[in-house]
C-alpha cells in the first residue's frame, strides 16, 4: 500500500483533496453550510462575479477566510489579456480577505460560450505572463496531455483537466487522456468540471488524480448539504482505493474460496 501525503500546491500543504466553488447556490447561507460539509480547504471565487454583482462583497464577508484558502478564478475571460487583468484583481481580493501571501489563481480562458471549453493557446499565453508576475497558476484545460506537460514545463503549479464541460454533470468522458496526464505529470493533477455524483469524484481519485474541484454538482443538488458530505466521502474513498491498489483485471475467473488442499474425507 502506498503511503499518503499532503496535497502540496505552490509550497502550501492541504489535507483535503476536494476543492469547491461558490457559484449557483440558492443563498449565501446554503453555500457556507455546504462548504463546511465538504471539509474542503480551498474555495474558488469568480473575481468578476464579486466585482460586478451587487452582493459580491457580501459573498466575501459570508465566508470565514481563516478556515478557507481563497482561489480567485478568471471565469468570464475570453483572452489572455483579460485573464491577466482579472488575476491581478483576484490577488488584491485575497489580500483584502486577510490572505496577504496568497498568489494563487485558477486560470480560465474561455471564449466558447456554448460549451465553455478553454482556449489552449490563450491559456498558455496567460500562464506564461502570470508566472513571471509570481502567481501560483492553476490552469483549467481540456484533457490534453501535450498541453498539460507544456504548462508544467513553464512553471504552473498544477494542471486542471476537465472531466467534461462545466456544469454538464457528464462525468469523466476522456479517461484515457486523463490517465496519461496523471501518469506524465510531476505536479498535482486536479480534475475540474463535469463531475456529477460522488462515484465520479471517486473514479477520478482512483485513477490517481491529486484532487477534484466541484461546484455545480453540490450547488444544484436537491439537497446541497447532503451532497457536499457525499462528495467529501467520495473523494476520500477514491483516494484510499488508489493508495490501497486495485486488483489486476484478468479474463478468467478466480475463486475467492479455492478448493485446493481441502480434505475429501
From Swiss-Prot:
Transmembrane portions of the chain: none
GO MF term set: thiazole synthase activity
Catalytic residues, chain numbering: 106
This enzyme's EC code(s): 2.8.1.10
Record keywords, A-Z: Cytoplasm, Schiff base, Thiamine biosynthesis, Transferase
Broadest EC class assigned to this enzyme: transferase
Reactions performed catalytically: [ThiS sulfur-carrier protein]-C-terminal-Gly-aminoethanethioate + 2-iminoacetate + 1-deoxy-D-xylulose 5-phosphate = [ThiS sulfur-carrier protein]-C-terminal Gly-Gly + 2-[(2R,5Z)-2-carboxy-4-methylthiazol-5(2H)-ylidene]ethyl phosphate + 2 H2O + H(+)
Protein's pathway: Cofactor biosynthesis; thiamine diphosphate biosynthesis
Superkingdom as given in the UniProt entry: Bacteria
Residues annotated as binding 1-deoxy-D-xylulose 5-phosphate: 167, 193-194, 215-216
GO biological process: thiamine diphosphate biosynthetic process
Cited Gene3D superfamilies: Aldolase class I
CDD domains recorded: ThiG (cd04728)
Chief subcellular location: cytoplasm
Subcellular location, record wording: Cytoplasm
Keyword Zinc: no
Keyword Transferase part of the UniProt annotation: yes
GO cellular component, one term: cytoplasm
Function: Catalyzes the rearrangement of 1-deoxy-D-xylulose 5-phosphate (DXP) to produce the thiazole phosphate moiety of thiamine. Sulfur is provided by the thiocarboxylate moiety of the carrier protein ThiS. In vitro, sulfur can be provided by H(2)S.
Similarity annotation: Belongs to the ThiG family.
SUBUNIT field: Homotetramer. Forms heterodimers with either ThiH or ThiS.
Name the UniProt record assigns to this protein: Thiazole synthase
Amino acid at each position: 500500500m502506498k503511503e499518503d501525503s499532503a496535497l502540496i500546491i505552490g509550497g502550501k500543504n492541504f489535507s483535503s483533496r476536494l476543492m469547491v466553488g461558490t457559484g449557483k447556490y440558492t443563498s449565501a447561507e446554503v453555500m457556507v453550510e455546504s462548504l463546511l460539509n465538504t471539509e474542503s480547504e480551498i474555495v474558488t471565487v469568480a473575481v468578476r462575479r464579486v466585482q460586478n454583482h451587487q452582493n459580491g462583497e457580501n459573498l466575501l464577508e459570508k465566508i470565514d477566510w481563516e478556515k478557507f484558502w481563497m482561489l480567485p478564478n478568471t471565469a468570464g475571460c475570453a483572452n489572455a489579456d483579460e485573464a491577466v487583468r482579472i488575476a491581478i484583481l483576484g490577488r488584491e481580493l485575497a489580500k483584502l480577505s486577510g490572505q496577504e501571501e496568497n498568489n494563487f489563481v485558477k486560470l480560465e480562458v474561455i471564449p466558447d460560450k456554448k460549451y465553455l471549453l478553454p482556449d489552449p493557446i490563450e491559456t498558455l499565453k496567460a500562464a506564461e505572463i502570470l508566472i513571471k508576475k509570481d502567481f501560483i497558476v492553476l490552469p483549467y484545460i481540456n484533457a490534453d496531455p501535450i498541453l498539460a506537460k507544456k504548462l508544467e514545463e513553464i512553471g504552473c503549479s498544477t494542471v486542471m483537466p476537465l472531466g467534461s464541460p462545466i456544469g454538464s454533470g457528464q462525468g469523466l468522458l476522456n479517461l484515457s487522456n486523463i490517465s496519461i496526464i496523471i501518469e506524465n505529470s510531476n505536479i498535482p493533477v486536479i480534475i475540474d468540471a463535469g463531475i456529477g455524483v460522488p462515484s465520479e469524484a471517486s473514479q477520478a481519485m482512483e485513477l490517481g488524480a491529486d484532487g477534484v474541484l466541484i461546484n455545480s454538482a453540490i450547488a444544484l443538488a436537491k439537497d446541497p448539504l447532503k451532497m457536499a458530505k457525499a462528495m467529501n466521502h467520495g473523494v476520500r474513498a477514491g483516494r484510499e482505493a488508489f493508495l490501497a491498489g486495485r486488483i489486476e483485471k484478468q479474463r478468467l475467473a478466480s475463486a475467492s474460496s479455492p478448493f485446493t488442499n481441502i480434505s475429501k474425507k
